[in-house]
Amino acid sequence: MQPISWRERLQAYYYLCRFDKPIGTELVFWPTMWALWIASDGYPDLKMFVVMTLGVLFMRAAGCAINDFADRKVDGHVARTKQRPLATGIIRPIEAIWVFLALVAASAALLLFLPIETFYWSFGALFLAFIYPFMKRYTHLPQVFLGAAFSWAIPMAYTATGQAPDLTCWLLYFGNLAWTVAYDTQYAITDREYDLKIGVKSTAILFNRFDIPIISTLQLSSLLLIGMALYIENLLFPWGIIGLVVVAVDFIYQWTKTKNRDPQLCFWAFRHNRWVGLIIFLAILAAFRF
């Protein structure tokens, strides 16, 4: 391959970090904001908001870089991922590692503005971000590890505000984890035929013909857990109920689209989950304001 210009290299890094595809950032950002708003009694500090937002952005990008490093030998065999920078060879594996480390360092710098407890919790975030991409080789439950990683910012938001993670925090955590496994299983269905050929494991393969019913069960579980958290914080009536009903209708709509397991429609449903987190956040915001 011919040498590439710095402009092309920077563009490859941009794609490596998925800055062109912000949905992953949104899926982490909104649950983080649920926790930040609730832990702050509806009035988070601006500095805290900025720090947590940048942390989500940096760590999600770091996760993408290490994910592509882990998948560099299989992405070329999957239609959806064969144009990723590492799969095409436009950048080297060592460059993905350096990008990952740089983003982790940027995230670590943000911890200087947060309490020491948040620093301790950050080791869990780093551990989960690093191991998740490799889990799909050893277990059919990589989506559970992704759910744990995507939800880790929830207890971190609590500690960032000086609060100890309480029952509400853990209800939000496991509610978000269930939702994450649901939408990432939708995502995995789109690649299932390729994953079966190349030996990549996923919940879509594990659940097999029960995939759609299990996704619906996970979505219902997430609504119940998040609803319990809102109830404890006196945020359920009426705005929390309104938000959760809207989300339930959206989940039903997703089911109508995915029940036949069309890969393109399953991918559409996955992307549609970006609205779920926003709707719940708006419900929390309204409950504090009205």
From Swiss-Prot:
The keyword Lipid metabolism does not apply. It comes from the Bacteria. It is an enzyme of class 2 (transferase). GO terms for molecular function: 4-hydroxybenzoate polyprenyltransferase activity. It is found in: Cell inner membrane. The keyword tRNA processing does not apply. Its EC number is 2.5.1.39. Pfam families: UbiA. Pathway: Cofactor biosynthesis; ubiquinone biosynthesis. It is a multi-pass membrane protein. GO terms for biological process: ubiquinone biosynthetic process. One of its GO terms (cellular component) is plasma membrane. It catalyses: all-trans-octaprenyl diphosphate + 4-hydroxybenzoate = 4-hydroxy-3-(all-trans-octaprenyl)benzoate + diphosphate. Keywords: Cell inner membrane, Cell membrane, Magnesium, Membrane, Transferase, Transmembrane, Transmembrane helix, Ubiquinone biosynthesis. Gene3D superfamilies: UbiA prenyltransferase (1.20.120.1780). The chain crosses the membrane at residues 23-43, 46-66, 96-116, 118-138, 141-161, 169-189, 212-232, 235-255, 265-285. Catalyzes the prenylation of para-hydroxybenzoate (PHB) with an all-trans polyprenyl group. Mediates the second step in the final reaction sequence of ubiquinone-8 (UQ-8) biosynthesis, which is the condensation of the polyisoprenoid side chain with PHB, generating the first membrane-bound Q intermediate 3-octaprenyl-4-hydroxybenzoate. PANTHER family: 4-HYDROXYBENZOATE POLYPRENYLTRANSFERASE, MITOCHONDRIAL, PRENYLTRANSFERASES. This is 4-hydroxybenzoate octaprenyltransferase. It comes from Acinetobacter baylyi (strain ATCC 33305 / BD413 / ADP1).
